[in-house]
């Protein structure tokens, strides 16, 4: 699942490549430069998410993409300890704000941990290769 998530996020972040100069090479498109505003997959995947008061409220577990590669949903793991008892919830991808703090990616969401804990839970279904409602989450 981590590989699929990283691949999906790589595709997502690569959509800004339209701004870069492109050189055609057969069926592939090679780039002679990359957009200076581009962000890496690791700026998002497995990164902490904070509320407006700088309290950690969760961690990015996955990003879901539209067929055109546009990100639409972020799965955030909230609660639990070392993964045990954690609940995965879905939020609109564009509701997460990305900035830099101390030269590191800093993700914020305009909500609090309790709101995320009370949101509907999701679980990854490997047979469908996507996230589905988790009717057993609290």
Give the location of each predicted region:
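Peripheral interaction segments used for macromolecular assembly
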Residues: 2-11, 15-138
């Amino acid at each position: 699942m981590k590989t699929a998530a990283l691949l999906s996020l790589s595709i997502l972040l690569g959509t800004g490549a339209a701004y870069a100069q492109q050189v055609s090479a057969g069926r592939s498109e090679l780039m002679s430069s990359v957009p200076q505003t581009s962000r890496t997959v690791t700026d998002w995947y497995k990164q902490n998410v904070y509320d407006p008061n700088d309290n950690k409220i969760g961690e990015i577990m996955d990003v879901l993409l539209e067929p055109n590669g546009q990100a639409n949903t972020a799965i955030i793991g909230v609660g639990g300890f070392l993964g045990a008892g954690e609940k995965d919830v879905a939020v609109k991808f564009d509701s997460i704000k990305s900035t830099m703090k101390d030269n590191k990616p800093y993700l914020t969401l305009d909500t609090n941990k309790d709101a995320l804990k009370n949101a509907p839970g999701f679980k990854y279904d490997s047979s469908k290769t996507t996230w589905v409602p988790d009717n057993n989450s609290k």
